Amino acid sequence: MTKKLDMTVLSTLPDTIATPAFDRSTLSAGILHIGVGNFHRAHQAVYLNRLFERGEGLDWAIVGAGLMPYDRAMRDRLHPQDWLTTVVELDPGGLSAQVCASMIDFVDVDPPALIDRLCQPDIRIVSLTITEGGYFVDPTTGGFDVSHPEILADLENPEKPSTVFGVLYAALARRRATQMAPFTVMSCDNLPENGLMARQAVVGYARAVSAKQADWIEENVAFPSGMVDCITPATGERERALIRETFDIEDAAPVVCEPFRQWVLEDNFPSGRPALEKVGVEFVSDVAPYELMKLRILNGGHAAIAYVGALRGHHFVHEAMTDPLIRAYLNKLESEEILPTVPEIPGVSFQTYLATVMDRFSNAAVGDTISRLCLDGSNRQPKFILPVILDRLDNSLNITGLALETALWCRYCLGSDEAGREILLEDENADSLKAWAKSAFSDSTATVWPELFGPLATNTVFLAEFEKAADKLQRLGVTDTLADYVSGP
């Protein structure tokens, strides 16, 4: 019989579900998390749950919070089940489930209530998952966008803010006025230098209100950066039904994720932190090398298989990974051209990390799609592939595979796969990309799009390699070009 999840049913759940191995009544709050989505509950909440199961860090339980309508919807779903979440790991060998109990409360979705809770001394860390767009970055300058309408509205009425950074400013100002130590602001969003992004937003907002307050925040508030990783697909009715049928539990807001998770944190917590190193979190002095490793090996790998996977007619990522040509192409490209550009990290084997990445890409249970990886190529290629090309050229190293990857992306932008089936190009620059692709595959001399490629647009070595790869694709087709690359020196 299916049971609705709450504290009263934990002892009656089947043995197939791991339940909390700690007395929840012994927990007290230490972290307030803004943006309680799927990723937070599959990642940070699970790490803390593991720590509590060791009987440690019991004063670091999570209080959920948010300011958006979807935060209110999440609160409404979690409240009747006592803030519990069923986390199902999509392992190729079979599903596994656990009830995560590290969240003990969720503040009313109301800015004054949130500010009040932030000003309680038990809150020593404020963590964030508010998405990349939530940091109000000016697309032109890269700085904090103080002219954004939502920010302007808060600045006109700073006593009643409605944005995350207006709320954080108000809470920090009140804590300072009452001589209470500030909390640490810990971004858990999946973007490079997330701590610097959080600092830029909080200080940028503060400086628009009070220079003295901004100076105090810069001097006294810590913003550690972190690298986070765990594939967490969206939860829909299919996932809720899967959990009902497999585990006999009714959860209004379950989470599904891959078994892999990683968290590397800059160890900068002046107000204290839980001992998460005991449950697998890596604390380091500098997160940047780990971010670069992930950016190039994992994100670069996604970019590498996306377009060739689409051109060879694959729908799912795991299907592409069973294609011997694509798997061999990815392994050669990563091993010979991408991995050597990542600076060494003591104690980390990049080949082992690559093997883990390829295993993750091969996980059929996750059901990741090629079309998702192909989205916004004009935004992703400059982040994940072009910097690697520049690094190799600066060191006079060959770029044969990377030029082929770029040519495969260009071929994808023509809008059809190798069998002639239509490809829907989902990119804000779709029209420009199509025009570029038609030009590159019709002219005797293939060219690149200057606005996108920057200095590579005039680099003769890159242009020659790109032209060679595009010409080969045009003459031989995708399959034979791949085979030629894989079997080559």
Regions found by a protein language model. Give the residues of each.
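Substrate/ligand-engaging "lid" and interaction regions
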Residues: 2-489
